[in-house]
UniProtKB/Swiss-Prot annotation:
Binding-site positions, Mg(2+): 25, 27, 84
Subcellular location: Secreted
Listed name of the protein: Dermonecrotic toxin LvSicTox-alphaIC1bii
Organism this protein belongs to: Loxosceles variegata (Recluse spider)
Gene3D superfamilies, per the entry: Phosphatidylinositol (PI) phosphodiesterase (3.20.20.190)
Enzyme class per UniProt: lyase
């Protein structure tokens, strides 16, 4: 999966898909009442990027629905969306409420209340393990609204670079048994080693691990892309999807990796 990083403005959806992204990451900020408010990152952000692009969350989600509905030219090119949920602005006790409000919002504006809505898979990426009740609030709301089937399209990620064992324990608390992506990374302005990504890959490949897929961020340089592929990740989050495509076409990688398609299930662990 080639994950376009920090896609917060409607025009950027086209821009990143045209460069080769089949997935995008979008930042979601919340108001004081735990409503998703803007798709916005703010400063500081990755080197070489405009940190201030934004939309109202509802407007972005409606545009995303259009892009990921059959009949749209992007439909079979963009099929995974990571919502990077900026919950650090919320009190811990608001996490469940944020999950409820996010679910209601996506149900209405993205899934069109279950009536021919957007088809992309969604990952809820949460920066704080203490906010695991966002997941339970989200799940319960879709069930209460009569749309438990939409949870088939939803996965989870804790993005705080916590110890993998602690992440697994938190999923157990939340009752999550699958649909788990694990991120690891750092801004493109800095370097980060592969110790934790290797631990995440080991969990993914072990019999009793909870992780289904692993992705690394933010990978912009050619050598960093090669090093990341050598770590056997499933996804690369990048500001330059065209560079990822270029490296995947190199002899060393083109037989080992392929770019995911709509038919690939992002919740299935790949077995060699």
């Amino acid at each position: 999966w080639i994950m376009g990083h920090m896609v917060n403005n409607i025009k950027q959806i086209d821009e990143f898909v045209n460069l080769g992204s089949n997935a995008i990451e979008t930042d979601v900020s919340f108001d004081k009442k735990a409503n998703p408010e803007y798709t916005y990152h703010g400063t500081p952000c990755d080197c070489g990027r405009d940190c201030l692009r934004w939309e109202y969350f509802n407007d972005f989600v409606k545009a995303l629905r259009t892009a990921t509905t059959p009949g749209n030219s992007k439909y079979d090119k963009l099929f995974l969306v990571v919502f990077d949920l900026k919950t650090s602005s919320l009190y811990d006790y608001r996490a469940s409420e944020a999950g409820t409000k996010l679910a209601k919002n996506l149900l209405q504006h993205y899934w069109n209340n279950g009536n021919n809505g957007g088809r992309a898979y969604i990952i809820l990426s949460i920066p704080n393990l203490k906010h695991y009740k966002l997941i339970t609030g989200f799940q319960q709301t879709l069930k209460d609204e009569g749309h438990a089937e939409l949870l088939d399209k939803v996965g989870y990620d804790f993005s705080g670079n916590d110890d993998i064992g602690d992440v697994q324990k938190t999923y157990e608390k939340a009752g999550v048994t699958g649909h788990v992506w694990q991120s690891d990374g750092i801004t493109n302005c800095l370097l980060r080693g592969f110790t934790r990504i290797n631990a995440a890959v080991a969990n993914r490949d072990s019999a009793n691990g909870i992780i289904n897929k692993v992705y690394y961020w933010t990978v912009d340089k050619r050598q960093a892309t090669r090093d990341t592929l050598d770590a056997n990740v499933d996804g690369i989050m990048t500001n330059y999807p065209d560079i990822t495509v270029e490296i995947l076409n190199e002899d060393a990688y083109k037989t080992k990796f392929r770019i995911a398609t709509y038919e690939d299930n992002p919740w299935e662990t790949f077995k060699e």
